[in-house]
Structures are given as C-alpha cells and as structure tokens.
C-alpha cells in the first residue's frame, strides 16, 4: 500500500488518539522507535498499532484487547473516534467492563459458546452475565 499524503497518517493518528504524543517525539512521524530509538509505553504502542490498522481503511476493524494498556478515558475516546471518523465496523474483544458498556451489541460467550447477545443493559437481566459483571465489580472494590 502506498500512502501518497502524510495527511492520511495524521488523520489515523488523530483517530487513534496518538497525534499529540507523536507530534512531541524528536522527529515527529519520522522518529525511530524501538531498541535503537525512542521507547514507547504499552498504551502508546497500542495507539500506534490502531493508527497503522486504520491507514488500510478497513471495512471491519477487529480490536482484540487492543486498548488494554490505555486508560479507560483514552480508550473511550479512541472507540468514539473510530465510530464517528471512519466508515468501518468495529469488533472489539474486551475484558474491561468500561469497554463492554460502550458497545452497541455485546455477544456473551460462556464455556466457548455464544450464550446471549444484546446491549450490556439487556444482558444484565441474564443471571450468568450479571454474575460475571458482579464478580468483576467486586474485584475492583
């Protein structure tokens, strides 16, 4: 894939909430990252990975715990940006309740099988799902 315009890169960085920290790197988007360059945090690496995926302009974007190292506020911002700024469907695999609550539709998998689907609030009426949510909330206390 050939990117003809750096505006595509900047747009993807903005959607992935990575634009600000990338702009502050010594050489911006041309900064060398890794062992011989600048070291990024786990959350920064995840946001760069999301931006790279968005550059391909996918019709479906699968995020498998792709924001686990990002704080919940930034994660919500990224998911909202993807929803409003792209034309792709988003499939999110998540364990964080804050992420699950943001979803339009949740597919609850229990013992390797689809047990139920619906909104988070709808699924709270199902005992197994409600018990799982309660267990996660108890852990945070």
Features from the language model and the residues they span:
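Short, small-residue-biased leader/transition segments that mark boundaries at the very start
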Residues: 1-3, 93
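ABC ATPase nucleotide-binding domain helical subdomain, centered on the C-loop/LSGGQ "ABC signature"
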Residues: 4-35, 79-80, 87, 126
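ABC-fold ATPase nucleotide-binding domain signature/coupling loops
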Residues: 19-48, 66, 70, 105, ...
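A short, proline-enriched helix->beta-strand linker immediately N-terminal to the Walker B motif
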Residues: 55-59
């Amino acid at each position: 894939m050939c990117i003809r315009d750096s505006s595509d890169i900047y747009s993807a960085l903005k959607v992935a909430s990575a634009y600000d920290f990338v702009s502050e790197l010594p050489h911006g988007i041309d900064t060398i990252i890794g062992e011989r360059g600048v070291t990024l945090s786990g959350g920064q690496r995840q946001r760069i990975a999301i931006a790279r995926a968005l550059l391909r302009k996918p019709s479906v974007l699968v995020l498998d715990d792709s924001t686990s190292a990002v704080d919940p506020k930034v994660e919500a911002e990224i998911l909202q940006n993807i929803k409003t700024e792209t034309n792709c469907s988003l499939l999110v695999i998540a364990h964080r309740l804050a992420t699950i609550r943001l979803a339009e539709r949740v597919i609850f998998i229990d013992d390797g099988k689809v047990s139920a689907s619906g909104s988070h609030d709808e699924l709270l009426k199902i005992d197994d799902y409600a018990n799982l949510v309660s267990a996660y909330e108890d852990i945070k206390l």
